[in-house]
A protein has these predicted regions:
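Thiamine diphosphate
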Residues: 2-167
Length: 167
């Protein structure tokens, strides 16, 4: 379990939190027919994604934000035991809407999470993984997010680049 060192805003109701704990995912901003989907793994990363979504929405970009609590439930299972725990493709598609573009912002290294979330990967042109780069351990929260390329402005910049490349 990873827990934030600082208090974070409450973004769910009690019922939503229970469902999220059961399913390993929470849709923080639902946007039918989203232009881009931001998937956050980690509380600080979720806050950055929510802020980035607001910036993108100001420019008429339809943006969905997903909080992934248990990335392992979305992996390709390695055996029958994992298959009982992991969601199948049908369930994944029901819980996480298909999207034309995705950005995954994770508190873990991007290489590792890319492998774990292969089933959510739309390919190198349509999915970007933004992971922790092991920088800024003594910085404040905003400094740590910035130095690791996970601030709301960093996410917004990557999203704009992806949107312009994939027109």
């Amino acid at each position: 379990m990873v827990a934030s060192k600082k208090a974070l805003p409450i973004v769910t109701t009690g019922d939503e939190a229970a469902t999220a704990a059961n399913n390993g995912v929470f849709i923080a901003i639902k946007e039918p027919n989203a232009d881009i989907q931001l998937i956050a793994i980690g509380g600080y990363q979720l806050q950055s994604c929510l802020k980035a979504a607001k910036l993108l929405q100001r420019e008429s970009v339809k943006c969905e934000v997903v909080a992934l609590l248990e990335p392992g439930r979305f992996r390709v299972p390695r055996d029958e035991t994992e298959a009982e725990y992991c969601h199948d493709k049908v369930m994944i598609d029901l819980m996480i809407a298909p999207a034309p573009l995705r950005i995954v912002v994770s508190h873990t290294g991007e290489e590792v999470i890319t492998g774990v979330l292969r089933r959510l990967d739309l390919g190198t042109e349509k999915t970007t993984f933004m992971g922790y780069k092991n920088q800024g351990g003594t910085l404040n929260l905003d400094g740590m997010l910035k130095v690791n390329g996970q601030s709301e402005r960093d996410i917004e910049s990557v999203a704009k680049k992806m949107l312009s490349t994939n027109k």
